[in-house]
Amino acid sequence: MGQKINPTGFRVGVIRDWDAKWFADKADYANQLHEDLRIRKYIEKNLADAAVDRIEIERSTKSRVDVSVHTAKPGMVIGKGGSEVEKLRTQLAKLTDRDEKGRSKRVFINIVEIKKPDLSAHLVGQQIAGDLERRVAFRRAMRGAIQRATRSGAKGIKVMVSGRLNGADIARIEQYTEGTVPLHTLRADIDYSWDEAMTAYGNLGIKTWIYRGDILPQKKNSK
């Protein structure tokens, strides 16, 4: 089962938390879900060069939306004197539904810095995709990503690239693995991502698994 299922979804509720934290009744659920999709799509499009890994959305009340942006380049997102993050907050507020009085929801943005981007599967996948789009040999791009992740402290990494590699007429799959990637172990902190590279010969799929160690449950002190 661990070989087939998405490693991130497999561990939600065990060692990972949801990226969307809110509850809604039947009447409001669809509207809030589409709000989330608009917010995520806008951030991914406008901060494509800011190395954004995750976007967390939390709603404590119906009129408040808290957005946490995990990025390896916080300075690019914040801007000089916080100008860029204020522009982002204003634009995200316009994407929310208005209340009965025509007012937009209050949006609060929290920037979370990723100190080791080479341990983020999504950022590693984006790096490989960028190399492939710049016509770097796929083996060189994959091995370079594996070496950087290993130097950053990864216990294991697996990278898989599929498609018309090097412009071949027949599509195929190539993969490299370094260390161990225990997909069946729920306590194993495995980050997974699927990315896409758009080349002159077609799109290439990139799957990345990074094993960052185990997350053990904390023991509760008995009184």
UniProtKB/Swiss-Prot annotation:
InterPro entries: KH_dom, KH_dom-like_a/b, KH_dom_type_2, KH_sf_prok-type, Ribosomal_S3_C_sf, Ribosomal_uS3_bac-typ, Ribosomal_uS3_C, Ribosomal_uS3_CS. Keywords: Ribonucleoprotein, Ribosomal protein, RNA-binding, rRNA-binding. GO terms for molecular function: mRNA binding; rRNA binding; structural constituent of ribosome. It comes from the Bacteria. PROSITE patterns: KH_TYPE_2, RIBOSOMAL_S3. GO terms for biological process: translation. The keyword Cell membrane does not apply. SMART domains: KH. GO terms for cellular component: cytosolic small ribosomal subunit. Residues 39-115 form the KH type-2 domain. Binds the lower part of the 30S subunit head. Binds mRNA in the 70S ribosome, positioning it for translation. HAMAP family: Ribosomal_uS3_B (MF_01309_B). Part of the 30S ribosomal subunit. Forms a tight complex with proteins S10 and S14. Belongs to the universal ribosomal protein uS3 family. This is Small ribosomal subunit protein uS3.
